Amino acid sequence: MIDGRSKDNSLKIIKKYSNKISYWLSEKDDGLYDAFNKGMKLAQGQYIGIINSDDVYTANAFDIIHKYITKNPKADFIFGSVKKHWGILYGYKPKKIKFSWGFYSSHSTGFYIKKDAAKKVGLYNIKYKYHADYDYFYRMIVKKKLKGIATKKNEVVGIFRRGGFSSTIPYRKMFIEELKIRYDNGQNILFLLILGIYKILNYWKKKIIK
């Protein structure tokens, strides 16, 4: 468990359950993805999974993931379905990652990767403060060509709860970083221009409807 010297009750809760935690660390970090990297470096098992402090696993999450690991030993990673406030985020269509309008397949809460495969991809790029997970997925799928699978839509392994880190980020900052990540990974400039216009129009459409 990695804590960035939280100012809430996180450390108190960690200490309360320390006998049930194999390892915990509380020190200043350089943002969410720096904490992810620390956890990945310390991970001892064959698979790595990450969950943010505001999110939760479903009661049968690990049974579902274990089933897919057992049936698909050659898969490098698994995208598990994640419940969000608007519906369920699910599926895996690798060809769509380059040109998808929105962000990609799973949330970090539903993502599991073999430790050996994670070493091939490297760490999360902490220069990206909001969407380093998309950059990670892009490198993993397009550049390293790792093989993955997804659980069925109704096999939900995690719940993304509003009010966490990503819920407090201004849309403009998220939008700019999304385009930067796509550009840095060599995506088509014409497509990025079209995507930018689409995102802006969609943003103002939602504003007007509200």
Task: Describe the function of each predicted region.
Residues 3-12, 52-55:
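A conserved acidic beta->alpha catalytic loop
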Residues 48:
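Short aromatic/hydrophobic "clamp" motif used to bind/position activated sugar donors
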Residues 32, 51, 56-61, 84, ...:
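Hydrophobic/aromatic residue at the end of a short beta strand that borders the catalytic acidic motif
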Residues 1-5, 25-26:
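Short beta-strand/loop segment that forms part of the nucleotide-sugar
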Residues 9-10, 36, 57-64, 74, ...:
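Acidic donor-diphosphate engagement hotspot in glycosyltransferases and nucleotidyltransferases
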Residues 91-177:
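Conserved nucleotide-sugar donor-binding catalytic segment
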